[in-house]
Amino acid sequence: MGNSQTKEFRPPLSSSNRRSHQWGSSSSHGRSPYSDRHHAESSRSRGSRPDLSILGIGGSSERDVATLEHRRETKQEREARRLEKERAARVKERERSMREEHVDGGYLVTQGVYVGTEDFNKAVTRQLMIERRLAPFWRGLNDFSESWTEHQLMAAARGLPIPPPDEIPPELEYKNPPKLSGDGKEPSIQHLMVPITSRSQSYGSEASQSSTPAHSLPAPVSPIASGTSTSPLFRSRAKTLASLTTSKLGSQSDSTPKEIHLPEDPFVNGQPIEAYLYKDATECPICFLYYPPYLNRTRCCDQPICSECFVQIKRPDPHPPEHGEAEPNAAAAEGDRQDNQDCQLVSEPAACPFCVQPEFGVTYTPPPFRRGLVYATDPTLRPNFTSPVSSTSSLASANASPGTGRRRATSLSANDPAVITTDRVRPDWAQKLANARAHAARRSAAATALHTAAYLMNSTASGNESRNFSLGRRGVMRRTGQSETPSASSRSGSPALQALAFLTDRRTPGHDTDSAEEGTGNLAPPRNSSRRNRIDDLEEMMMMEAIRLSLASEEERRKKAEKEARKEAKRREKENKKAEKAARKHGFYSNNASSSALDVPSDARLGRVASTSSSITGEDASPSKGKEVDRTSPAATAASSQSSTEIASESMTINPHPNVVEQGPSAQSSMAQLSPRELPKPSHLRQVSSASSSFSSLVESTGEDHSGAYDGNASSTEPLFNFRSLAAVIGDEDKGDGTAEHVEDTSSKPSAEGSASSTAPVADEMPGQSTTPADPIAVKTVAEDRDCLMPKELETQSVEITSATRNAEATT
């Protein structure tokens, strides 16, 4: 006692020390069979306190752990031991029942046709068989022939080898029936008649029990001692069997009448009872064994079926309703359940194996004789009978109409008193259904709770926000204040999703205006709310979850469509760029800018024009600033200078008249196609630049000497890349004031005006003037490439128009 108190207040030892104390104490007290080896191990592992085992401190802990281990082993093996014990008891009881009990030559226990679990109610089945409302368990024959003799039928019924027809084995020999004297007729007549109430006690007497031999019964039946059938010992053994194999609900200790044995009579009408039963054997259509013709008959289609097959037919396991049907035969205890629970499990009644009609049941017509067990018909016990048909009435009906009558032409109702349904031999089906429903409800509630907790914790959390999953009882239904009141910017998705997430917060009105610093919000319903409110809340949340999923799928579909549209636009843009690049390459290589003679107008009345346009708009400005090394050879530079001089002199020679303007579209097109990214040789670009410089100086030198009229519709080639004619610019100048004007971004002007001015005839053209026709190939190239090249290459051009040019236009 002191050791156990010390153990309670002492700090818990380590597992190794505790184990060492246990084995050490067991070695000192001699309880362990492995004391020597474990004592050595405990001496090594005890450490600094080897004297505890000597004092016996570890004894109590050893007893506790040993008891705990023993209890654990018993708990694991208890179910197996119980099942084994019940199986042994059933085997023993079966042997005893087959040896001592029978009903009209049949048995009250199964014959081993089915080896599965016998889950039917054996007490109810026994009572129905004794009342002759259900056929007993006949012994089935594997083979049968109508030509068999009596001793062959007896051998087949007892399970012995079938002898030849003309040979009778010694064990099958039977004595002749008793002499039909006056003393012998009376018992047989009494056995075939309804038992008289005043003489019912004499059937249990010793004289009536021992008056007939028992050697010719289907099984070796020993005479029972006097008073055994009515003694408490016999009834207690039957009740013990019922208590071992049935539930508490099936025990009918108060309503079960007394069982009595009729006098043993192995003969019926002078024949052995086996020969009388099996001479007209009938095959069971389910197990294909041959039985006496006194079998059960289905109530619906009047088909024979043995009792061993009948007790195997039962209701299917509880399952969800199929095709929306409701259970018609619910138990009375199930009637008070809520109607809104439409997803409960149901248990359908068993169907007939022949015609598949529900509410399977059978009827039984017993043979015209009585042997074995019957219920006593004491008047004091008659009011306690719970069955509508007693053994007396069944005996009377059996004597009135034997089983060889005409086949029934109509089916019987399942509620008929003579019908035994499968629910009768399994009355616990309602309890099994209730247990299955309760189990399903618990599983559904657990799953709903998990889904609800996960939904509440993740409804308003953003995708990148870390989620805090708390699995505690209170933490499952709560979140921190930061996750409960997130900002609008932290939520991803459409406004509809944000609104739905806000609705699913399920906060109380008092918490809607609270800040995030107030702590945890009450997401779960109050504890005092009813179960109905919780169910409604769960249904509402499930509906919101469905709406949220629908909106999320729609949002995902919309994003996917936008992504596809962006991909298509990008693909089209890439194709356009490829086409433009191909067009540029085609225009550049088809028009040689260096080989075209830049047609220079010889009109001296152009005035002083200062061109500030660059040679190529897309060209980088770094070469003009001296930041790049000049890689052009001196020969190329000299060639470019010579080419520019030849251009100026040739233009002055070809156009001697001052007011004749020669348009060179090929020069415009070829110069427009030049680009620093597409030029194959940098020397060509420098040659064009040198020509531009020479031509600019030429225009400035000739502008002072010529002051004649100028045709506004005639356009000349500007220094290199001015694709708009000066005549169009001068025409725009007339619409403005008299001051100088800088024209920027001339690409915005209509290109048709320049084209018209380039092709219009000169109004005041003198005789002898001739205009050089433009190259048709160059004109076509300009028309094709002007739209895509002009906006990029004319942004940096500016033209300054002097007063001399304006006066010339006015004079014209």
Swiss-Prot record:
Keyword Cytoplasm included in the entry's annotation:
yes
Keywords of the record: Cytoplasm
Q: Name one GO cellular component term.
A: cytoplasm
Please list the residue ranges that the record marks as compositionally biased, kind Basic and acidic residues: 34-44, 61-97, 172-187, 317-326, 554-582, 732-747
Q: Where is this region: Disordered?
A: 1-97, 159-187, 200-232, 244-266, 317-340, 384-412, 507-533, 554-718, 732-778
Composition bias, Polar residues: 244-255
Kindly report the protein's main subcellular placement as a broad class: cytoplasm
**What are the subcellular locations of this protein?**
Cytoplasm
Query: In which domain of life is the source organism classified?
Result: Eukaryota
Q: Which InterPro entries match?
A: Sip5/DA2 (IPR039301)
Q: Where is the composition biased (Low complexity)?
A: 14-33, 200-211, 387-401, 632-651, 689-701, 748-758
Task: Give the protein's function.
Answer: May negatively regulate the snf1 kinase.
Q: Which family does it belong to?
A: Belongs to the SIP5 family.
Protein name per its UniProtKB record: Protein sip5
